[in-house]
């Protein structure tokens, strides 16, 4: 499985690089994100396999109630990384370089305009004002959510003693 995942990730890596060799000197945002997602999947699989070898299930693991935070933490973290890949490839940080507001608004008005929600704006994101605003907003919002989850995780982790195996 590892070799297959690595081969797929490498193949998409070449597809991603090839997308930047033709009309423009940068790669396609979606191809970059697919390559990044495959890399995250490969890394996660390798980490999971390593942990299964180092800590067999019979041994168990210490528990103090933080387990309920791990799934949301991992999901939002991976979402944040994927949105970061789209942001990087689409160069949306150039459009909204300021923080915490985006050109004076928390939620840019272009996102709330129903007429902007077209496939064309997602496909041709370089000519669109909608896609950079949406991706930047989602990336920032998921970062805020990630901070809340990490704080909840840390409060839970440090407020209870670890029970023995």
Q: Which residues are covered by each model-predicted region?
A:
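Polytopic transmembrane helical bundles with strong interfacial aromatic enrichment
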Residues: 1-165
């Amino acid at each position: 499985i590892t070799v297959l995942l690595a081969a797929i990730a490498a193949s998409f890596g070449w597809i991603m690089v090839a997308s930047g060799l033709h009309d423009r000197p940068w790669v396609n945002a979606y191809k970059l994100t697919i390559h990044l997602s495959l890399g995250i999947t490969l890394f996660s699989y390798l980490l999971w396999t390593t942990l299964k070898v180092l800590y067999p299930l019979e041994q168990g693991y210490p528990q103090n109630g933080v387990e309920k935070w791990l799934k949301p933490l991992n999901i939002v973290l991976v979402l944040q990384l994927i949105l970061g890949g789209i942001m990087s490839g689409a160069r949306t940080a150039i459009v909204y370089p300021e923080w915490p507001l985006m050109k004076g608004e928390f939620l840019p008005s272009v996102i709330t305009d129903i007429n902007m929600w077209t496939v064309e704006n997602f496909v041709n994101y370089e000519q669109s004002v909608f896609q950079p605003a949406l991706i930047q907003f989602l990336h920032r919002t998921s970062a805020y959510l990630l901070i809340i989850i990490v704080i909840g995780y840390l409060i839970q982790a440090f407020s209870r003693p670890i029970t023995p195996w």
